[in-house]
């Protein structure tokens, strides 16, 4: 028998309803299955490192939130005014050493590394030619903050698929947190005498990021320190910014003077800056461990032609409009 239009429409609605209910049932069954299965934290930690590698991180480590050992040094550094005009360094006090205050309930911090060294860096040629401007290698490509943060967010969402109750928060220079002590505790490397993290297989030309989570994952241990008696970074600093091993006086650092300092650069430092117009890499370039630096995998970190060894005489002719165009999406926009 033929169906009336009303009957046919009713059957279609019934079929659609059954399909929707089936989808919802499947979803809730999946959630129930995930929640009902005992969580193997060791296996999950292993998978997190695999997922991190798939997302473009060259190294992933896990550590707890106890950074109390770093608090006295941080306070002493602030007391000596080594942070200069970076008042935001002191604004949050010891919160930098207490990740659990940023995300209540935090039990672990996942620390990640992403290489940024471009293949055609041409360090020496640019620095030795006084007619060319030197831009710190990390700033030659697109701003790393958004890229790393998005990847960390994806990592958190992937973990959440296996632990639906997970709370997480990604950080890439976006909150008061001691990323280097975290990276050191997580086994990504050790703190060099220039205060940067060094890795035996990657040197120091890499970015760091953190993912705070509330899972009691097994933690990784620190690696052995490898600087020994080497003081090359202290010796090479044009302005004597590394005032003692592992301690940088930002007020003397060329990176601070050319990026962070809002006023005029003190006269005593001007001739020492040379052709470095944005940042400085000298303490990294001289480091023996950077013979093992790894090149960046990300196309976004490729140097922009206008920023890669620009003739200084041409920079004087840049208009504001051209500057904004050339630095669009670049970390240089922060100055």
Give the role of each language-model region.
Residues 8, 27-29:
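Aromatic (phenylalanine/tyrosine) cluster motif
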Residues 35-226, 265, 274:
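Auxiliary alpha/beta "docking" domains used to position bulky ligands
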Residues 57, 232-255, 262, 276-300:
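Iron-sulfur cluster-binding cysteine motifs and their immediate structural context
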Residues 265-335:
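Alpha-helical scaffold domains
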Residues 2, 11-13:
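Basic polycationic patches enriched in arginine
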């Amino acid at each position: 028998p033929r169906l009336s239009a009303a009957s046919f429409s009713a059957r279609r609605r019934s079929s659609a309803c059954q399909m929707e209910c089936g989808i919802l049932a499947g979803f809730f069954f999946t959630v129930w299955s995930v929640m009902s299965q005992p969580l193997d934290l060791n296996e999950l930690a292993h998978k997190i490192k695999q997922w991190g590698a798939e997302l473009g991180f060259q190294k992933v480590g896990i550590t707890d939130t106890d950074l109390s050992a770093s608090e006295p040094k941080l306070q002493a550094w602030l007391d000596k005014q080594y942070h200069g005009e970076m008042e935001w360094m002191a604004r949050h006090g010891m919160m930098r050493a207490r990740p659990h205050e940023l995300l209540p309930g935090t039990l672990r911090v996942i620390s990640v590394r992403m290489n940024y060294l471009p293949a055609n860096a041409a360090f020496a040629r640019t620095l030795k030619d006084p007619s060319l401007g030197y831009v710190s290698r990390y700033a030659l490509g697109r701003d790393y903050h958004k890229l790393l943060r998005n990847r960390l967010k994806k990592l958190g969402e992937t973990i959440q698929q296996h632990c639906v109750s997970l709370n997480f928060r990604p950080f890439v220079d976006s909150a008061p947190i001691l990323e280097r002590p975290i990276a050191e505790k997580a086994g990504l490397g050790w703190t060099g005498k220039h205060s940067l993290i060094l890795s035996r297989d990657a040197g120091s030309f890499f970015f760091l990021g953190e993912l705070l989570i509330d899972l009691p994952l097994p933690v990784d241990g620190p690696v052995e320190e490898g600087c020994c008696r080497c003081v090359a970074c202290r010796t090479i600093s044009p302005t004597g910014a590394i005032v003692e091993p592992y301690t940088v006086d930002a007020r003397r650092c060329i990176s601070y003077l050319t990026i962070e300092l809002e006023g005029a650069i003190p006269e005593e430092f001007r001739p020492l800056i040379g052709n470095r117009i944005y940042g400085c890499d000298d303490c990294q370039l001289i480091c023996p461990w950077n013979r093992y630096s790894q090149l960046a995998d990300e196309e976004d970190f490729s140097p922009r032609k206008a920023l890669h060894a620009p003739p200084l005489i041409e920079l004087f002719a840049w208009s504001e409009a051209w500057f904004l165009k050339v630095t669009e999406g670049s970390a240089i926009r922060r100055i």
